[in-house]
Regions:
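Catalytic phosphate/metal-binding cores of nucleic-acid and nucleotide-processing enzymes, i.e., regions
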Residues: 1-116
Length: 116
């Protein structure tokens, strides 16, 4: 499965459960290079998911998406480590994790261990 197809599945699941989704899309520059025109350090996770309920509970998840064979780059690992150190919930999700992803996104308070 291509990463963009997997990403669409994750976004659909997140929206089904009421999560707000942020994804910065890469664009092709005039010189043919691909870039994401935002400022910041390279390697920021692909998705930021945010949810709050009427009872005041909420959650924020940072998710780096990879194909089943995709490799997490060093600059991506650095972001994941920094986010974890700051107390954030952060995952590397792969297509084989879809059931666990769905379970995690269906609940606010439970943290489901997912492949890294």
């Amino acid at each position: 499965m291509k990463e963009k197809d997997f990403q669409q599945q994750v976004i659909s699941i997140a929206r089904m459960y009421g999560w707000k989704v942020q994804h910065s899309r890469a664009v092709q520059m005039a010189n043919g290079r691909w870039a994401t025109p935002i400022q910041g350090e390279a390697g920021f996770p692909d998705l930021v998911l945010v949810k709050s309920n009427h009872d005041g509970r909420g959650g924020v998840i940072f998710a780096e998406l990879k194909t089943d064979l995709g490799r997490v780059q060093d600059h991506q690992k650095a972001w994941i480590c920094a986010l974890h150190a700051g107390g954030a919930e952060c995952y590397v999700w792969r297509p084989t994790d879809l059931l666990n992803i769905s379970h995690r996104l269906s609940a606010l308070s439970s943290h489901v261990a997912v492949t890294q």
